[in-house]
Amino acid sequence: MKMNKHYNELKASYLFVDIAHKVAAYQEAHPEKEIIRLGIGDVTQPLAKCVVQAMRDAAAEMGTKEGFHGYGPEQGYPFLKQAIQGYYASRGTQIAEDEIFISDGAKSDLANLLGLFDVDNTVLVPDPVYPTYVDDNVTDGRKIIYSRTGQENGFLGMPDESVKADIIYICSPNNPTGAAYTRAQLKAWVDYARKNDAIILYDAAYECFISDGELARSIFEIEGARQCAVEICSFSKIAGFTGTRCGYTVVPKELEREGMSINKLWLRRQTTKFNGVPYVVQRAAAAVFTESGMAEIQSNLDYYRRNAKVIADALDECGVWYCGGKNSPYIWLRCPGNMKSWEFFDWLLENCGVVGTPGVGFGECGEGYFRLTAFGDAEKTKLAAQRIKTAIKAL
């Protein structure tokens, strides 16, 4: 038999393996020192109480003859889809129930959506980039081109009219840089996509961190986006579902290519290859959008926002350039002293006992930059920020 040779084209990812080895070596050499991890991309606050209660109630319901649920609708139960509709409507965006598809997370949908598109399409991704965008397309054999970003454009790449792309990845607020597009910038991308008959895959996993009312929480706040974009969303960061697994994707009915409805194709794909998200999980997700759920979730988000401000304030005191933090859980900083990304990693670990993520691990344009996250413990984040501030000032 023949294998998919494109898997052999995947670059070996040593980023987090190397981080783990370096941290282990440091701990062995300095067993008395406490290491603070600010490189984690996972949440640390527990699920909201109302979410846990909803799971308990749904599990108990499943234990009764009257309340048992077997296979559910592949595209999600109406009660959750309607709750998501209300979430969009509360921000002034109207989405139809049959445009919402419940999934086991954004990462799955980002990969599975590609099955609707031919492998001859050209893909445009930013650099630095969330590695999954690249790997998903390498394994399909698509051509990938990069939108190079840097300090000069705030790590927000803009359309290049000399470049023709068919599939465009946008993540705003961005992972890893924390940068967020303005409405005007998103409109430029929408116009570019429509002009080139391209489709935007809009990763909105971090929209819940946006506190600036001038920034869009959804691509569908932008005129024309319903004709060129799919929005992929997650419960992981808004509600701490990284270990529970639930997300959703919005596919507008207006979105068509070559006379085919992307909405209908995605429905067919899901009903063919996916059996849906468990009833208990969907009940938990629906609880997120209740009045008490939103209040509890905001409390957790504020916890992470305070952590981000603590880190940002420390960098401000040191005069270190950074982006993100305000509308994002990620702080993307310029390595002080013109250090390279891994050089700064070693320096930070040795001098501060703090672990972050070297920017070069996200692409060539990440060299000389570094990612810190706000997902840690509040007291440890304060301690880490103080250590970083003291050490940088002593450089």
Task: Please state what every model-predicted region is.
Residues 222-302, 309, 313, 393:
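Conserved core segment of the aminotransferase class I/II
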Residues 282, 286, 301-312, 322-335, ...:
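Conserved glycine-rich beta-strand-loop-beta hairpin in the small C-terminal domain of fold type I
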Residues 66-193, 207-222:
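Conserved core of the PLP fold type I
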